Amino acid sequence: GVYVVVDASDGQVSLANNNSYLGTTQIASGTLMVSDNSQLGDTHYNRQVIFTDNQQESVMEITSDVDTRSDAAGHGRDIEMRADGEVAVDAGVDTQWGALMADSSGQHQDEGSTLTKTGAGTLELTASGTTQSAVRVEEGTLKGDVADILPYASSLWVGDGATFVTGA
C-alpha cells in the first residue's frame, strides 16, 4: 500500500490537512509536527504512525488538541514501535490515540526500543497495547482510558513532575 515516510534528519516536517493516502505514516528521522488527525492519512482507515529507524532521532510533536479517534474506523490511530521514538505534546494540549503497539512487521523491533513522552501536555491512549518497548514519561502526562494500557511493556519510568494515570 501507499504510505508516507518522514526522513527529515534533524529537521521538522508538517503534512497538509485532509491527506487521503490509505497507508501508514512512518517516522524514520526528524520531527513530524501534527496539528490535525487528517494530516496522517485517510481518517476512515486511521492507519498507525510507526517509528522505524533506531539509528536516528525520531519525534512526533503534537502542537494542538488532536483526537485521532474516528467513528468510521472505530478506534484511534495506534503508535507502532519498530524503533525508539519520542512523542512530544505541547503545553496545554490534550491528544487522544489508540494503543502503543508492537512491531507488526514480524521483526520484533519493539523489543529493546523506548517510547519517550515529553512536553507538558497530555498523551491519552484509549486502548490496551501489545508493545514490549520501555516507556519513559519525562514530562507532562501519559493517561490511559483502560486499566492496563501497557500490559507487555518491558518497563515504565515516570520522572519527577511527570504523571502516569490509568483509567477504568
Placement of each model-derived feature along the sequence:
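Beta-strand repeat architectures
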Residues: G1-S14, L22-T95, A102-E124, Q132-A168
